[in-house]
UniProtKB/Swiss-Prot annotation:
Keyword Cell wall biogenesis/degradation appears in the UniProt entry: no
Gene Ontology molecular function: any one: pyridoxal phosphate binding
GO cellular component labels: mitochondrion
Catalytic activity: phosphoethanolamine + H2O = acetaldehyde + NH4(+) + phosphate
Documented EC number(s): 4.2.3.2
Range of residues in the leader sequence: none
Organism this protein belongs to: Xenopus laevis
Assembly with partners or alone: Homotetramer.
Transmembrane region(s): none
Stated name of the protein: Ethanolamine-phosphate phospho-lyase
Length: 509
């Protein structure tokens, strides 16, 4: 039997043999997970953690039906898709049945990155064009072609990292974006920016192959595009000879509840040309898929070049995929996402009335974001405060992450078996954390705080030298003048001393 390593030993070996860019959660005190079940994960001491961040274990960690399907098929056969096998075509039929009729051709691959990379190949072959429009703060994968279309990543490389054939459109964020909730038609306004990008590209003798977007931005801060945005963008992109790629890698398979696919939130009159899938598709097993139209698939095949993927669509992966689809239906996980998601959002909105640090609650189903702000008037991101909260929750055995361009958005994307009791537990703990934090940093909690009223923060006069110095009220946005990464600042303001500092290099969760 193999020796069981301590956390310290694991970190020592990781430092020696695992690349330094491969990060872990809670780097100052990482968690060693030894098993998981449903929405819970367990460490080496048997401590149970509520998992609020794992959109990979879609139907629940270690679901017995998924395990049974994998074992049964693995005992019989696992080979590649060049041999005929029932599982491949059965799974293709079942998957296609969840999509609009025109999306009818599958390419099975092994990760979301592979899926998005193949989607770009399909788009470029079909259109004969090269350029791609992507959204600001987008993340689409780790391979070179996808880093190129992921501002979330390439902005870290400097101002010259953006390729000339990549065009970045504003994220359709109606809370802190270019056009906000008070705009009469933010969907049209954001879509007009895409039209302007296309026109500018044409002026520079460039042609658009594709517009790609997550149906709801995850790493970008849990952004829900305004209704009608995708329809208008699709119209402009098609007119320019391009195609629309909907990235469902993080948000597909019923997470929004009402619909199986998040792009369907835009309405029945919107149809992407290519849809990519990953993460939840195999409940932790490495598999993914690209689904497109017959016309695009035929154009790709017309090159005469075979497309073969060694592991894509193998019998074991397809058996697992079938089990996941079956569980989503049998256990009514879409219904659960709607019911529990609505309950979670209601509880969080109650906390918004109580806590000035909460600027916005947004989400659909079990995809929810809590935008933390230093003040509601200027919507100044509460980055250090968000990191403090997720570390304090970790102490309570609750796993939550923060992301977005300022790392100030608490992200809920739990396994789909997440229930009302779990939601109540998490929100109660967030309430306690915010209450203690607001008291420590001098923000006055007020249930009746108006959206246009800044949260006031009491700041001691550090130059007086008097421990009983008179407190003065300042708009909390002034706190930007001090570095939230400074250790003394963090301790003096009640922030968790071990929580990670604000850096442009983020762990994608």
């Amino acid at each position: 039997m193999c020796e069981e390593y301590t956390k310290e030993k694991i970190m020592e070996i990781r430092k020696k043999h695992i690349g330094p860019s491969c990060k872990v959660f809670f780097a100052n005190d990482p968690i060693k997970i030894v098993h998981a079940k449903g929405q819970y994960m367990f460490d080496e001491k048997g401590e149970r953690y509520l998992d609020c961040i794992n959109n990979v274990a879609h139907v629940g960690h270690s679901h017995p039906e998924v395990t049974k399907a994998a074992l049964k098929q693995m005992e019989l056969l696992n080979t590649n898709s060049r041999f005929l096998h029932d599982n491949l075509v059965r799974y293709a039929e079942c998957l296609i049945s969840t999509l609009p009729e025109k999306l009818s051709v599958c390419y099975f691959v092994n990760s979301g990155s592979e899926a998005n990379d193949l989607a770009l190949r399909l788009a470029r072959q079909y259109t004969g064009h090269q350029d791609v429009i992507t959204l600001d703060h987008a993340y689409h994968g780790h391979v070179t072609s996808l880093i190129d279309i992921s501002p979330y990543k390439f902005h870290q490389l400097g101002k010259d990292a953006q390729k000339e054939y990549i065009h970045v459109a504003p994220s359709p964020d109606t809370y802190r974006g270019k056009y906000r909730e008070d705009h009469p038609d933010p969907a049209s306004a954001y879509a007009k920016d895409v039209e302007d990008i296309i026109q500018k590209a044409h002026q520079n003798k460039r042609q658009i192959a594709a517009f790609i977007a997550e149906s709801m931005q995850s790493c970008g801060g849990q952004i829900i595009p305004p209704a009608g945005y995708f329809q208008k963008v699709s119209e402009f992109v098609h007119k320019a000879g391009g195609v629309f790629i909907a990235d469902e890698v993080q948000v597909g398979f019923g997470r929004v509840g009402k619909h199986f696919w998040s792009f369907q939130l835009q309405g029945e009159d919107f149809l992407p040309d290519i849809v990519t899938m990953g993460k939840p598709i195999g409940n932790g097993h490495p598999m993914s898929c690209v689904v497109t139209t017959k016309e695009i698939a035929e154009a790709f095949g017309a090159t005469g070049m075979e497309y073969f993927n060694t592991f894509g669509g193998n019998p074991v992966s397809c058996a697992i995929g079938l089990a996941v689809l079956d569980i989503i239906e049998k256990e009514d996980l879409r219904g659960n996402a709607t019911t529990v998601g609505n309950y979670l959002t209601e509880l969080l909105n109650e906390q918004k009335q109580k806590h000035p640090l909460i600027g916005d609650i947004r989400g659909v189903g079990l995809f929810v974001g809590v935008d933390l702000v230093k003040d509601r008037l200027f919507r100044t991101p509460a980055t250090a405060e968000a990191q403090h909260i997720i570390y304090k929750l970790k102490e309570k055995r609750i796993l939550l992450s923060a992301d977005g361009p300022y790392r100030n958005v608490l992200k809920f994307k739990p396994p789909m078996c997440f229930n009302k009791e779990d939601a109540k537990l998490v929100v109660d703990e967030i309430d306690q954390c915010l209450t203690a934090l607001e008291k420590a940093i001098g923000i006055q909690s007020n249930a009746g705080l108006h959206e246009k009223t800044s949260a006031k923060r009491k700041v001691h006069n550090e130059n007086s030298g008097d421990t009983n110095a008179k407190e003065k009220e300042t708009c909390s946005s002034n706190s930007q003048e001090r570095n939230p990464n400074d250790h003394a600042y963090r301790q003096s303001n009640g922030l968790h001393p071990e929580s990670p500092t604000f850096t442009r290099k983020r762990i994608r969760t």
